[in-house]
Amino acid sequence: TSIIDDPTGYGRIVRDAQGRFVSITEHKNATEEERAIQEIYPSYACFDVQRLLESLAKLDRDPLSGEYYLTDVPAMMHGDGLKVEALTAVPAEDVLSINTPAQLAEVDTILRGRLQMEATT
């Protein structure tokens, strides 16, 4: 997962009171409380292949969007009693979206800074 300042558009990591993973809620399905969560799903995941295939076979369309959400699979696995962990391991700048010229400029600045740093080390 990643913690970002503006999680608009991203799936949110929902945790219980003890900080354990509960689910991933897509932005368009999120409540106001969930939209306030800054921990997001950056679309990186590791699964046991057999368990993933079993879960995909049970996956239903989201009633709001009509889409199939891969992000529903970890909650399904959790509900089936399987161990699901969500680790905060992705730097915020590695999950930035590029949908506008301003976002492109931001990512360009970050990349140029990284390239300059690599060139000097």
Where are these regions (language model features)?
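Catalytic-core segments of class I nucleotidyltransferases/pyrophosphorylases
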Residues: 22-95, 99-113
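Short beta-strand-to-loop element that shapes/binds the nucleotide-sugar donor at the catalytic cleft/hinge
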Residues: 1-14
